[in-house]
Regions:
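Short, charged/polar surface micro-motifs in flexible loops or helix N-caps
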Residues: 10, 33-36, 293-296, 348-352
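Short Gly/Ser/Thr- and Asp/Glu-enriched loop/turn motifs at secondary-structure junctions
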Residues: 98-102, 139-142, 281-285, 336-340
């Protein structure tokens, strides 16, 4: 058996932990620079606020209904996510963190257990220790466990836990479960299936396997088998290096100056290089992009994209920043206001897999490695950005997070204060 623990409306729930006065009231959390809604409480969803809705388009709903609005506080959310994971580790020998608000639990080998009660116990213990509401689904496969956890959110009477294992129960659920909500079925795959009359997860399981293989290849077959109760998706409780890394941001104020834009891109490149080094990998290519505000139809639009190919796969700070800045100068167009920019590392491989050229200057490479290691050590001790390259600028461009809550769990100065009379 596998369990999927999914934190309900996670970012909004984190804000409520330290603001109990918001229980039962509409809450939303905004993205970088307070651009759009990325988390909504059930009460906010009921008001018609959609995921990803630009804030300026829903501001009238917010003001009319007294919706509590927060800027994203990733330090808080990351810490609360870890606290939930610590609770989950009490219930299973292995936990696979799937995302900041989801984790799989490997329950194989656990016998003579009332899994329905176990799911509810996991949920109640997460609430008791963290005050985060968690929906726990248990089923024979990871895909079915995902569906079971969704049922918990739809039906409060399940009390946060659902054990789905009997064939007749699985069939009943799959007959009503929309194909577009099945884990592993992407937008394009969904469009193909709908055009064939496949509207539910049950419809999908009734297709012949060879037809699924022809239509959606091996990933589609895995999902098909998982829905039929056959575990096909491996449990991954160890670290897996990312195959692409993107660092991007929307700007609070549009950037029209080339130096300001290249400074921002240099900082994104620095962060990307750091992420590569953290997983001991290197990138063969890097994409650099910048574009204007697509919501301003009355202003000129441009989308700039430049692909950089490294002669030698790299995670070196100076090499990556220099290449990113050069690309920024190449794609910049005068007269446009850039709203968002970023960098993406692709074709990633492990450092140990790199084949070095006979003509490579090994001494220079070793010197660059020592410099980068020293930068990482200093910034790791005294904080990110303590030492940086000149191309990264002075940090004069700040993101807008006017509605951010305190860092309750990660900064001493932000600890909640209690008055005793």
């Amino acid at each position: 058996m596998f369990a999927l623990a999914d934190c309900n409306n996670f970012f909004a729930s984190c804000e409520r932990v330290f603001r109990p006065d918001l229980q039962g009231k509409p809450v939303i959390v905004l993205s970088n620079n307070d651009g759009c809604a990325v988390a909504r409480s059930n009460e906010a969803k009921a008001l018609g606020i959609k995921m990803g809705a630009p804030f300026f388009k829903i501001k009238h709903i917010v003001e009319k209904n007294n919706v509590a609005v927060f800027s994203g506080n990733m330090a808080l959310y990351g810490d609360m996510s870890q606290r939930v994971r610590w609770v989950l580790e009490e219930f299973a020998p292995a936990v696979e963190v799937y995302s900041i608000d989801e984790a799989f639990l490997d329950l194989r080998g656990m016998e003579n257990i009332d899994f329905d009660a176990y799911a509810k116990k996991i949920s109640s213990e997460c609430w008791r220790q963290t005050s985060i509401p968690v929906s726990v689904g248990i089923a024979p496969t990871k895909t079915l466990a995902k569906i079971a956890s969704k049922l918990c959110k739809q039906y409060p009477k399940l009390r946060g836990g659902c054990y789905m294992h009997r064939p007749q129960d699985i069939e009943k659920v799959l007959r009503k479960f929309p194909i577009e909500d099945v884990w592993g079925i992407g937008r394009k795959s969904c469009a193909k299936l709908l055009s064939m009359g496949v509207k539910t997860a049950w419809d999908y399981t009734q297709l012949p396997e060879n037809a699924v293989r022809k239509l959606l290849a091996l990933p589609g077959v895995r999902t098909w088998r998982e829905l039929r109760g056959e575990p096909c998706i491996e449990f991954e409780d160890g670290f897996e290096a990312k195959q692409s890394i993107c660092v991007s941001r929307s700007f609070a104020k549009e950037i029209t100056d080339m130096d300001e834009l290249s400074e921002q891109i240099a900082n994104f490149a620095s962060s990307m290089a750091e992420k590569l080094r953290q997983q001991r990998s290197v990138a063969c290519e890097m994409a650099v992009f910048a574009y204007t505000n697509r919501f301003k139809d009355n202003e000129p639009q441009t989308y700039g994209n430049s692909l950089v190919h490294f002669e030698q796969p790299s995670n070196d700070q100076r090499t990556i920043i220099a290449s990113a800045v050069a690309a920024a100068h190449e794609l910049y167009k005068k007269g446009y206001g850039y709203k968002k920019a970023g960098v993406v590392a692709t074709h990633i491989m492990q450092e140990s897999e790199v084949v070095h050229s006979l003509f490579e200057d090994s001494q220079a490479a070793e010197r660059e490695h020592r410099i980068t290691s020293a930068l990482d050590a200093i910034n790791g001790t005294f904080g990110r950005g303590t030492v940086k390259l000149a191309a990264q600028g002075s940090g004069r461009i700040k993101s807008s997070s006017e509605k951010q809550s305190p860092h309750y769990t990660t900064l001493w100065d932000d600890l909640p204060k209690v008055s005793v009379k």
